[in-house]
Amino acid sequence: MKKQRRRPGSRRILRLTGRHWLLLGWTILLAINNDGAEITCPEECSCRTTFHREEGRLLRIACSRGDMHTIPVDYFDRNAQIISISAPAENPNFLTIGPIFTQPIPFVNLQELHIVNSNIPSIGQYSFWGLQNLRLINLTYNNLTSINADNFRGLINLTELHLDHNNIEQMPSETFRHLTALKTLVLSNNQISTLVPRLFRMLAKLSYLDLSDNPLADLNPEVFKDIQHLRVLKCRRCLLRRVNTQIYHLVPHLEELDLGENLFKYLTPDEFISLKKLKKLKLDGNQLSVIVDYMFGRNRELRALSLARNRLALLAPAALTNLSALVHLDIGHNKIDKFHLQTFAPIVDTLKTINFSGNNLPLNEIAIVLQILPDIHGVGMANLSLTDIPPNFFTYNEHLVALDISWNKLTKFPYKLLTKTKFLQRLDISHNKLQTLSEQDLQRLEAIAQIDLSKNTWHCDQCSAGTMIVYMTTTVLNATIRNLRCYAPMRLRGKSFADMSFDLLEACPSTREAQMSVIAGLMLLCVAVLAAVAGALCCSRRRAAHYYTDEEKRREHAHEHPDELLARAELGSVATIHAPFALAPKGS
């Protein structure tokens, strides 16, 4: 077989190609560096070009110094894709906006506009006219009191609008009718007391609506007729006492519902019957006293349920029936003191995290539940007044990854307990009464990724904290221990471990001091014995004094009445002589 001959000059062609690739690589690197270089822009701002994987090259202008009274748009590059105007909380801006981004030359490439903490009183009618590529507007932390449809004219491609943390009180019908592409609307933390009918007309694509922290008190079903494809609804802290269930019929695709921290006292058994696609439900922070049987019977796709911080004393035996997809359950900070085991039967195979914190539960009630939940990954047991946890408490939960035992009364680190949880990666043992950690405790902690040991009563003497200081400087526990603060002795209270060294620690009590303590104890014992002896002698003397006093009285009486004494003596003699005969039995 003949070998193919390489054509003349082919090696040179390959070498030239390699050189070209090298030159091309250098060119690309230089181009990237040039893209990230600073661009001429106003002194109070920074302008930089970045590269986004999906969007490509993006020119970002950011002004965050604060105390701005005008936006220097005349000095902005008109090709900017992102403009961000913000200010520190202590040094806010005082701005007004109008058609500054549209005239005389519009920012036609602008995709995101953030104007935050700038005391903007109003938006204006044509502030965004012609900005057809604008996708996100963020006007949070301003002083907006009202909005209307003309404020958003021309924003046909806007998908996100953030108006939270303002002072908006009212919005007319069809306020957002020009925002036909809008998917996310955040109106939380305003002063909205009423939602007028057809407020959300033309928002057929809206999937995320946040109305939290507004004094709504009630929700009108007519408001939700135009947003039937809503996926997330948040009405947290809205003073709601109930929700008209007709609303749930109008938003059947809802996947997340947050009604936390309202004023609900009860829920009807068919409350959420229409929300068959619901995956996350928050009812925490209300006034619910009971969860009745089959409350969530139609919510088979529910994965997360929060019932924390209510007034629940009991979960009905069938309260969780049909929740065969439930992964996260929070029943913390209620008044529960016992469980029905059948309550947890429907979720045995799926539940991964459960929070028992802040209830009146004894450990044995929790232990029984954990025995039937072998695949549990996260457990909350905070604020249960625990002084100790048995070493075999998590014997059936070998897959435990996260454990919260904060806000208890633990005085010793639960080393033996944690040796049973080999996969533990997150541990919160803060706000207890731990004073020290031994070397074996620290070795166990080295294997845990996230640890919170703060707010314990750490003793900063060489015996208690010496080993901890050594571990702070030589192991991965550096950051964890550095953040701790001394509780005792008083002269070191509040001092950070980061500022401590072994030499600064209080000296351990010496052997001589220990001996002196023993001697002092013996001396106190001797004093107590002497006091007892002295008391006994005092009592004896008092008795003797009484005896001699009585004898003297008898003698004085005999001296004054000799005849009586003589008669007693004769009577005694007669009794002595005749007594044997008197005691003799009959017939003797």
Provide a role label for each language-model segment.
Residues 2-7, 11-588:
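Extracellular leucine-rich repeat
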